[in-house]
UniProtKB/Swiss-Prot annotation:
This is Protein kish-A. The keyword Glycoprotein applies. It is found in: Golgi apparatus membrane. It comes from Xenopus tropicalis. Glycans are attached at residue 35.
Length: 72
């Protein structure tokens, strides 16, 4: 089933996108900083969410991991 139609899969994709963008921005800041607008600006925004809300994102990742491992 597609991640669009399954809510849990959609949340997983969004969490992975946020974590990946924050990690890439930490490694190569210029890669995401030059594209702050447009369709590629989504990745910059995800990186900012990952940096600023990192404790909440980490808790969401742990909760999602436990729900995948033990509730499915």
């Amino acid at each position: 089933m597609s991640a669009i139609f399954n809510f849990q899969s959609l949340l997983i994709v969004i969490l992975l996108l946020i974590c990946t963008c924050a990690y890439l921005r930490a490694l190569v800041p210029n890669l995401l900083d030059k594209n702050k607008t447009g369709i590629l600006g989504i990745f910059w925004k995800c990186a900012r969410i990952g940096e600023r809300k990192s404790p909440y994102v980490a808790v969401c990742c742990v909760v999602m991991a436990f729900s995948i491992l033990f509730m499915q």
